[in-house]
Every structure is written in structure tokens, then in C-alpha cells.
Amino acid sequence: MSIKSDRWIRRAAEAGMIEPFEPGQVRTAGGNRIVSYGTSSYGYDVRCADEFKIFTNINSTIVDPKQFDEKSFVDFKGDVCIIPPNSFALARTVEYFRIPRSVLTICLGKSTYARCGIIVNVTPLEPEWEGHVTLEFSNTTPLPAKVYAGEGCAQMLFLESDEVCETSYRDRGGKYQGQRGVTLPRT
């Protein structure tokens, strides 16, 4: 497996792998510095959309991944999401992905957030998966933390295999195939 470069990412985006796509790095908006997004040397920095689901314990339910209670979240739409101390929120990428059959995509958090105690987690994007990426933001601090919509939040790394997989995510009817918006756990 080899990591793919900015040139490869731009070509793949022209074929529809990432929409919308930013071919360079964006670091300012309206004259103000932002958390960067767009194509980097060996990755693509995704943006957080303005839809969030913020975890709450007001309903005192048990978190069960097999029978997840949607009442565990409060829906929020806005430019800035404030995550309560030691809590988390779900969001999604602005970008919609269509991963090629020979590619596995790994997501890593941005250091700007990590250095503030905000951790981004995303499981790998498997071959032939497509959809908006659901982002998990954990606020590991004892203070409220901000996440900015429309700005960079995580970096995707594209690894291409020297052999195409026998069975892709699409082939096996993956439960998150084609997801749009913030998607809760499914079994």
C-alpha cells in the first residue's frame, strides 16, 4: 500500500471522489485566520458542516451501541458548536466522498484541535464506500470547547493497495453506504 500525493488526490477529485473539492489549502476567510482545509501534500483536510448532535445526559439513558437512543443527543445547527466539558458531539463533513475500490482512507484529527483537548475520531473509509463522513468530537477537557463549522477539522489519508479487494464495502451492503447528514450508530 502506498500513500497518495496531492496530484493523485486532485485527479481522483476530478473523477468525483470528493465533492465539493478544494485543490489547495485555505487558511483564511473574510480576512480572518481559520482552521485550514483542502488539499495538503499527502492528504485532504475536510471541513465540518453546520449540523451537530450534542450528547446530553438529561434523559438518563444507558449508552448501548446495539439499541442507541436518539434522545441521547440534542440537535444543533450553527457556525460554532460548544461541546460541554468531558462530553462529545457528532457532526459531518461538508464533503461527500466516493472511495475507489483499490483505496482505503484513514482519518486523523487536526493538531489545532488536538492541542486544545478536542479529539476527532473517524473509522476508516473502506473501498467503494460513499457518503458524508460522520465525525465524532470528544472534548477531553473540564471546560466547554468550540468546534467551528465550515473550517478544517480532520485530515484524510488515501492508501492505495497493489491489489484490488475481492469484496468492497458496497459489495457487502455496508450499513452506512450512501449516508447523508449526521448518522447515528446502526447494527
Swiss-Prot record:
Pathway: Pyrimidine metabolism; dUMP biosynthesis; dUMP from dCTP (dUTP route): step 1/2
Keywords: Hydrolase, Nucleotide metabolism, Nucleotide-binding
Catalytic activity: dCTP + H2O + H(+) = dUTP + NH4(+)
SUPFAM superfamilies: dUTPase-like (SSF51283)
One GO BP annotation of this record: nucleobase-containing small molecule interconversion
InterPro entries listed in its UniProt record: dCTP_deaminase, dUTPase-like_sf, dUTPase_trimeric
Binding site for dCTP: 110-115, 134-136, 155, 169, 179
EC number(s) per entry: 3.5.4.13
Residues of the active site: 136
GO terms, molecular function: dCTP deaminase activity; nucleotide binding
Annotated signal sequence range: none
HAMAP family, sorted: dCTP_deaminase
Family recorded in the similarity comment: Belongs to the dCTP deaminase family.
Reported function: Catalyzes the deamination of dCTP to dUTP.
Full protein name: dCTP deaminase
Origin species: Bordetella pertussis (strain Tohama I / ATCC BAA-589 / NCTC 13251)
Gene transcribed to yield this protein: dcd
